[in-house]
């Protein structure tokens, strides 16, 4: 199976999700991504699984699924004040 994305990092810092996919790192506010993620505690946030294809991320405790493609598109549409490219 060909990987959609090569995800090398997914972590949380304050109220942000930081994702490195295909050597591109993006930082998005949790409240801009998902209400469930924005309200989650540290344990809930860190209990995630990246799909084998690298296409999606699943949070078991939150019953939340997000696509990496969707996160990258959201990053591209956010205004410069709401995003940070690392």
Task: State each model region's role.
Residues 1-86:
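Motif-centric detector for short Cys/His coordination patterns
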């Amino acid at each position: 199976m060909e990987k959609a994305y090569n995800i090398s990092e997914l972590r949380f810092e304050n109220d942000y999700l930081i994702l490195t996919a295909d050597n591109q790192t993006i930082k998005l506010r949790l409240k801009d991504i998902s209400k469930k993620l924005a309200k989650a505690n540290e344990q809930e946030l860190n209990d995630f699984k990246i799909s084998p294809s690298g296409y999606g991320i699943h949070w078991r405790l939150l019953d939340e699924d997000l696509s990496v493609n969707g996160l990258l598109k959201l990053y591209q549409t956010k205004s410069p004040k709401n995003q940070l490219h690392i």
